[in-house]
């Protein structure tokens, strides 16, 4: 009964259809792949041309705070105002080739380092004259609001996602899969017996809130590999000491979402050598892009349609909650709504990769 009641709470608010006219697409003139992705998405999703905002900024993944303010935030804000889109836009979509993360001067929970996309969620507030604190995470007002549609003026923020992968082919395939997402398949939840109890409890709660016949939950010391017809996957990623391989051989359905409790999985979208593999923090000689940990982009390359990641240390408390993410998505919420319902903080280290409008359609085969 508890499972049904919570699913119905999600379903009751999932019918508020959001449209391509509410999406702002951000491309970078300094990046050929960014231009290619932006144009393809606008065409594929029928986003109005007036909703395409061009930046001229370095395509480097890591930038200084002043570059973000002057070359990204200010031009986007000016564009929204000039086009009369400040309140019309609900979603902002960045692209591969738009800078990924802002370097910081402080570390720990008081850092001013952040993901570019997470900073952009606050642009609505900034345009309206508010000045959020620069250091540390800001509260996400949409977090856990499963009984409310994302709307103005209730939620003064933008839902920001990124169309990124290792190359244009990966991103194009991801966009195409988002258009074919269907409500079928299984949710794979892989616990880590040696990890923090909190994350494991979130995974157990997710299992209770999803249809029992569609859940694969593993509480053993093994690592789930080779599952087919996967529509949702959550685990500890490379933080599970029993995981030795970079790829898990999962068979992804169109629309499949991924989330992991991993500190640096969104650190880069540069493709590692095929010979590279996840390793330990002691094995510094074999780090890739400054870390030994699993990569968000690997899941997208393998066939997932959406994934979360972290550009710097987020701390477990600020990672996406699978017990909110998957029930929301299953109920008919968009990809962007589902992820942001599950993320506690803004102006932080989180990224969401995928088409914000991706939504599970009814499976006509059932």
Indicate residue ranges for each PLM-predicted region.
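Cysteine-dependent hydrolase recognition
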Residues: 18-366
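N-terminal signal peptide c-region/cleavage motif recognized by signal peptidases
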Residues: 11-14
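Sec-dependent signal peptide recognition
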Residues: 1-7
């Amino acid at each position: 009964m508890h499972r049904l009641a919570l699913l119905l709470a999600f379903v009751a608010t999932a019918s508020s259809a959001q449209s391509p006219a509410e999406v702002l697409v951000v491309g970078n003139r300094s990046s050929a792949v960014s231009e290619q992705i932006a144009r393809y998405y606008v065409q594929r999703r029928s986003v109005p041309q007036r909703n395409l905002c061009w930046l001229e900024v370095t395509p480097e993944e890591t930038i200084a705070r002043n570059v973000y303010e002057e070359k990204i935030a200010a031009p986007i804000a000016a564009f929204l105002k000039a086009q009369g889109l400040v309140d019309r836009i609900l979603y902002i979509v960045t692209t591969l080739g738009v800078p990924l993360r802002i370097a910081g001067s402080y570390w720990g929970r008081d850092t001013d380092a952040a993901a570019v996309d997470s900073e952009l969620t606050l642009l609505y507030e900034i345009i309206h004259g508010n000045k959020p604190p620069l250091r540390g995470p800001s509260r996400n007002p949409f977090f856990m609001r499963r009984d409310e549609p994302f709307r103005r003026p209730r939620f003064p923020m933008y839902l920001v996602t990124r169309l990124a992968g290792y190359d244009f082919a990966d991103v194009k395939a991801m966009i195409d899969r988002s258009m074919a997402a269907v409500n079928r398949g299984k949710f794979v939840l892989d616990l880590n017996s040696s990890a923090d109890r909190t994350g494991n409890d979130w995974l157990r709660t997710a299992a209770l809130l999803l249809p029992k016949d569609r859940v694969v939950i593993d509480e053993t010391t093994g690592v789930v590999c080779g599952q087919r017809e996967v529509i949702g996957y959550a685990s500890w990623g490379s933080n599970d000491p029993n995981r030795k391989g970079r790829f898990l051989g999962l068979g992804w359905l169109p629309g499949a979402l991924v989330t992991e409790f991993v500190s640096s999985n969104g650190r880069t979208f540069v493709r590692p050598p095929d010979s590279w593999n996840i390793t330990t923090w002691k094995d510094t000689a074999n780090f890739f892009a400054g870390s030994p940990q699993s990569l968000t982009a690997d899941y997208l390359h393998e066939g997932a349609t959406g994934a979360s990641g972290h550009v710097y240390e987020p701390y477990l408390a600020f990672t996406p909650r699978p017990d909110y993410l998957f029930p929301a998505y299953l109920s008919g919420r968009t990809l962007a709504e589902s992820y942001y319902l599950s993320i506690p903080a803004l102006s932080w280290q989180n990224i969401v990769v995928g088409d914000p409008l991706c939504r599970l359609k009814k499976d006509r085969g059932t």
